[in-house]
Curated annotation (Swiss-Prot):
IF-3 binds to the 30S ribosomal subunit and shifts the equilibrium between 70S ribosomes and their 50S and 30S subunits in favor of the free subunits, thus enhancing the availability of 30S subunits on which protein synthesis initiation begins. One of its GO terms (biological process) is ribosome disassembly. Signal peptide: none annotated. It is found in: Cytoplasm. One of its GO terms (cellular component) is membrane. This is Translation initiation factor IF-3. Keywords: Cytoplasm, Initiation factor, Protein biosynthesis. It comes from the Bacteria. Belongs to the IF-3 family. GO terms for molecular function: ribosome binding; translation initiation factor activity. Pfam families: IF3_C, IF3_N. Monomer.
Length: 173
């Protein structure tokens, strides 16, 4: 049995290689197994299209529908589903080991806002020059970030050193 076309279900004469179909009329009533050409003639009498709903069943299930309206409604459903879908972004907050209190507070407000929007946050702590020798200061700073966000976020990846920066990823709860 040929697979359905890529742009939706087959309709009318596009349905090929079938002798009988399980027919459902426009009111949703099951008419039983009917020869394909009889079903096509009945659809034309009613002024609707014969649309293949379940091509993989034996015999294939076909229904009387207005094919144009059917395609329109399917497209509408897909668009609605796409609108409801939220893509999770990873936002980055860059810190330094010697960050001042006010600067830290501003960064934490941004982190809170990102979590409210449902985004993940990548906290990057960059070491410059000899600061790399004092990784414990950076680790304490990232632990502080972790403590302050523990109610709204969970740690996805623990702080780890990559080159001259320490990275931690937080995800909203």
């Amino acid at each position: 049995m040929p697979a359905p076309q890529k742009d939706g279900p087959r309709a009318n004469r596009d349905i090929r290689g079938v002798r009988d179909v399980q027919l459902i009329d426009q009111d949703g009533q099951n008419r039983g197994v009917v020869p394909f050409f009889d079903a096509l003639a009945m659809a034309e009498e009613v002024g609707l299209d014969l649309v293949e709903i379940a091509p993989n069943s034996v015999p294939p299930v076909c229904k009387f529908l207005d094919y144009g309206r059917f395609r329109f409604n399917e497209q509408k459903k897909q668009n609605e589903a796409r609108k409801r879908q939220k893509t999770v972004e990873v936002k980055e907050i860059k810190l330094r080991p010697g960050i001042d209190k006010h600067d830290y507070d501003v960064k934490m407000k941004a982190v809170q806002r990102f979590f409210e929007e449902g985004d993940k946050v990548k906290v990057t702590l960059r070491f410059r020059g000899r600061e790399i020798a004092h990784q414990d200061i950076g680790l304490r700073l990232l632990e502080r970030v972790k403590q302050e966000t523990q109610e709204v976020a969970k740690v996805e990846s623990e702080p780890m050193l990559e080159g001259r920066q320490m990275i931690m990823i937080l995800a909203p709860r």
